Amino acid sequence: MAGAKEIRSKIASVQNTQKITKAMEMVAASKMRKSQDRMAASRPYAETMRKVIGHLANGNLEYKHPYLEERDVKRVGYLVVSTDRGLCGGLNINLFKKLLADMKAWSDKGVQCELAMIGSKGVSFFNSVGGNVVAQVTGMGDNPSLSELIGPVKVMLQAYDEGRLDKLYIVSNKFINTMSQVPTITQLLPLPASEDDDLKRTAWDYLYEPDPKALLDTLLRRYVESQVYQGVVENLASEQAARMVAMKAATDNGGSLIKELQLVYNKARQASITQELTEIVSGAAAV
């Protein structure tokens, strides 16, 4: 059994770690609330844009934009949203597992995959497993802006425009609540027809200014950008929630470990006292 001094040192070490994890839990909780506010603020725009685009996809347009047309699939692209920091449980690895399974399904059909990464954890993971990473952006912090995301989005849209990609997806974690974040893969291009029954029942007539091509070129690009930005802010809220839960679990585990070490310490101290008493009694008997 370890000595009492060594056990006291372990207890102090765990207590110090527990203070750190508790502080990180509180910081993550604060950041999560701010991220939720940002996510809630951007959702109405993203949802409205999705509805408008859904009407376009279901409508009979006089100009058929390339983003609305299905192609024979030879190459697919993924915009992958991960975190820049760790200590957030299985948030990233669950997302990567889902993406790898989807990529394997395409690969089995002879389809090649390209990746544009948002977040350093995704960059390091897919570089290590040999993923074809064609664009990346990292270090966006806790308040990302749309301008920071333009690089990877532009690369993938250009590849799609030039026919080097036939499908484009966004891969991110969808924030459900503090305890639940779901990895999702959502098709961006070609624009999928909406499954919303209300959209199917309602037919819109369109008046274009200045002309259909100019309008749709701008509108559909804004749609892709808005969905990517929404994916990033939802992933950020998911990250902070997962980190808060992970740090709370670490703090609770630290408390359990301290109790166990305290019990071991008490036993060691009791054994030491018993040994000292035995030595005193033995010495007195010898006299």
Curated annotation (Swiss-Prot):
Produces ATP from ADP in the presence of a proton gradient across the membrane. The gamma chain is believed to be important in regulating ATPase activity and the flow of protons through the CF(0) complex. Belongs to the ATPase gamma chain family. This is ATP synthase gamma chain. It is found in: Cell inner membrane. One of its GO terms (molecular function) is ATP binding. SUPFAM superfamilies: ATP synthase (F1-ATPase), gamma subunit. Its main location: membrane. The lineage of its organism: Bacteria, Pseudomonadati, Pseudomonadota, Gammaproteobacteria, Enterobacterales. Keywords: ATP synthesis, Cell inner membrane, Cell membrane, CF(1), Hydrogen ion transport, Ion transport, Membrane, Transport. F-type ATPases have 2 components, CF(1) - the catalytic core - and CF(0) - the membrane proton channel. CF(1) has five subunits: alpha(3), beta(3), gamma(1), delta(1), epsilon(1). CF(0) has three main subunits: a, b and c. One of its GO terms (biological process) is proton motive force-driven plasma membrane ATP synthesis. GO terms for cellular component: plasma membrane; proton-transporting ATP synthase complex. It is a peripheral membrane protein. PROSITE patterns: ATPASE_GAMMA.
